[in-house]
Amino acid sequence: PTIRAWTSETYGRAWDADLYGTVKETFKHDSTWKLPLNWDNVPDGAYRGDRDSSLLLINGGSIVEDKSLTSAGKDGRMYKGLLIRNSEVGQSSVFIDRIMYRYVCGNLQLWGAIYDKRFRRRHVGTNVVRDVIREITTTAQEWTTSDIGQEQRIIDAITSHQLAFTKAGVIDELQKIGFTKKVATDAYERCEQTEPISPFTTWGIVQGLTRLSQDSGYQDQRVALDLQAAKLANRAVEVAA
């Protein structure tokens, strides 16, 4: 006989149908959290590939302000969202990410997003879905009622933090903390092309990175870049604290 899978007695699995079906039922009567609209103005927000899947829930209230946009005469509102991700094939755990974002376009790509907090549940044991749903409801409640003033201070700290004062200096700083030279250079140049804020700032590079992530056709690659951006943003917050 050929063994195709070998698992321990603690092995468990959160199937997409069970996970997202329960999420749907949990939020069915909660108007605070909704699915984003697609190009046809129809609620959407679900993605499923051969390796992973995700569901995006958005909150139209409790906004904070991106002053790099408002100072340039643009809409600087940032909204809150929950991004739930899973992999039935075991490529990753179940993740719940708290995010702030500028907008979701019709093909459900997040623009100007930063990751605020993450929950991770491995595919171990018999209560994976139960544990995840419990965390989602807790996180959604906390995210809805969290301190707007504190969140605004976080955004302000990231927008005011300078990485360096030259292009070469910024790229060098990014390489020191794990970015490749290509990604660092591309993020800098994308910020120059698309953002009103200086690419010398952490916020400028974060926005450059999140725009780069949208170039990828694969969810895992997009998320990897977005998480790099989140780590960079958190670093600026720690420096400012």
PLM-predicted stretches and their roles:
Residues 21-240:
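Intrinsic disorder/low-complexity polar-acidic segments
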Residues 1-24, 199:
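Feature for intrinsically disordered/low-complexity regulatory segments and propeptides
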